[in-house]
Amino acid sequence: LFELQDEGYRVFQAKLMPNISCDRIIGVRTPDLRSYAKKIFQMPEAKEFIQKLPHDYYEENNLHGALLSLLYPEDIETFLAELERFLPYVDNWATCDMLSPKIFRKHLPYIYERIKKWLQSDHEYTVRFGIVTLLDFYLDDAFDPEMLSLVANTESEKFYVKMAVAWFFSIALVNQYE
């Protein structure tokens, strides 16, 4: 990852995530990180890497998220087990929001039940992940008005949860105006 480092981008990223020490940010741009994940996901080291938690760097967490989707594109049970093992280590909004697994599209009713559990978590970014997942996958034909109450009743004083709630309602208003 250090071979992909962009020092200016590192400084920029640090300003966007004040809760992450600059020493924990390498400065790898997301398209480069995703390309790297596609290069390595078939290597045995990829599965070894996702087994080692916690990671030291912000980009390692992002790589972890990218690898999950590549390693388990069809196996929802294994994907969810690995995702739920990883979520407690997500420590910032950017890593959280980068997780948008395409596999969810094939399992919307099943994932919706998981979202309800994630919204009850004590972990800020697990709750945010649940809200962002609703935003990413359920504000189209999968929408149910119950989702509005579900998000509105999310109990958290955490800043990044409140921001996700506001974001959800802004997109819901646009996509589901009635």
Describe the residue ranges of each PLM region.
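Alpha-helical scaffold domains
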Residues: 1-178
